[in-house]
Amino acid sequence: MNAHTFASGRMAKLRQKWMLALALALMHAVLGLGLGLGGVPAHANGLDSLEQFMRQAKTGRAQFTQVVTAPAKPGQTARSKTSSGIFEFDRPGRFLFNYQKPFVQTLVADGQTLWMYDADLNQVTARKQAQVLGSTPAAILTSANDLKALQADFVFQAEPDKEGLQWMRATPKAKDGQIQSVLAAFRDTDKGPALAVLEVQDSFGQRSVLTFTAYESNPAFSATNFQFKPPPGADVLRP
């Protein structure tokens, strides 16, 4: 194995690990957290916004910018990387991330399979969603029917309003998962709350902040929008 092949393989593993962590975070924060929140106290502004968002927005589309900051190593400063693209979702269980800069990458959950495609490496990784979620609190989120079921595994709290946004936090009670906490912020619009910021802190010390703009509530998607077919010639991995 030459150095280029080794470096490419290492890069592929790092990208897959990062994209999988992002997928789990999105299943937590966008597709699942709002299930059964009808009993949220009226004074909890961030939770109220989440409840209304989940009740009203069955589908959505937005542009996003993501900044991922890795913890600083001894003697070094923290490293950050920025990416951007288009995000779409259709509850329950389907979403699409089209990364356009700096690399073309696609992350698709079709309700059965989680697909991760790296155009630069011409590589596809396919995982069954149920297996991916099986060892995480997201498995409970996507099947919970009421707030009581969610409270068995998560602590929900409203955060103070900041910069004109309503904030809430969800913290897993289990200490062995990949996600330490999720912060979500909503912006008031004439069509109801719009998802504005998603901040994820993982167990590796990595912090991901996604800022959403040009949000559209309940757009109509084609039947094939969340389907994925590996490009001809792409390597397909099914770990």
Task: Indicate where each model-derived feature is located.
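Short, solvent-exposed helix-to-loop capping segments enriched in aromatics
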Residues: 135-149
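N-terminal mature ectodomain segment of secretory-pathway/periplasmic proteins
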Residues: 55-111
